[in-house]
């Protein structure tokens, strides 16, 4: 048996995104929603697939790199997908971290900062999810890949993946009923 104890390292090391994206670990991921998270304790790239984790919560203390992580994930998603294949909705209650993505063609509108409009975006996302479940059911498709494959065979319109990114969810929850 082993016991592992994590000790903060006073000597931080910079993890650059490009080498992560060029790593074998990332290149071997075939998913359009693959993203690089960083390096493990032995310096090996850590990659993940948003398809396998449809809900992701990034938590940590102030200054621990949550927003940097969200930015890296978003950059990976944008670089691996066209705006026709991936649409992103972003909510930023603090009006700070996600504003840099305004103007990116993958966005469904602009980065939303108004609390009332954020409620509208969340309601739209729920309606869109329900609508997509009905479409999948009608097409006898288990997932979006199968649905789109069937649509392509019939030369019909496919659906893009939709990713909703919320920075500072706690702030949004505190100000919304």
Map each language-model feature to its residues.
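Conserved alpha-helical scaffold flanking the Walker A/P-loop in AAA+ ATPase domains
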Residues: 121-124, 146-157
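P-loop NTPase catalytic phosphate-binding loop
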Residues: 2-6, 20-141, 159-177
């Amino acid at each position: 048996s082993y016991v592992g104890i994590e000790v903060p390292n006073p000597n931080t090391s910079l993890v650059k995104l490009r080498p992560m994206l060029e790593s074998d670990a990332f290149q071997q991921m075939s998913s359009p929603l693959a993203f690089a998270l960083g390096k493990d304790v032995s310096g090996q790239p850590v990659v993940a697939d948003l398809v396998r984790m449809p809900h992701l919560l990034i938590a940590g203390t102030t200054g621990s790199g949550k927003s940097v992580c969200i930015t890296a994930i978003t950059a990976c998603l944008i670089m691996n997908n066209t705006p026709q294949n991936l649409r992103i909705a972003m909510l930023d209650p603090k009006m700070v971290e996600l504003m840099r993505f305004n103007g990116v063609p993958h966005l469904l509108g602009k980065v939303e900062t108004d609390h009332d409009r954020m409620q509208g975006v969340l309601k739209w996302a729920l309606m869109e999810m329900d609508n997509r479940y009905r479409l999948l059911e009608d097409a006898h498709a288990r997932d979006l890949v199968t649905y789109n494959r069937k649509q392509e065979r019939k030369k019909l319109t496919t659906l893009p993946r939709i990713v909703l990114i919320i920075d500072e969810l706690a702030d949004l929850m505190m100000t919304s009923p």
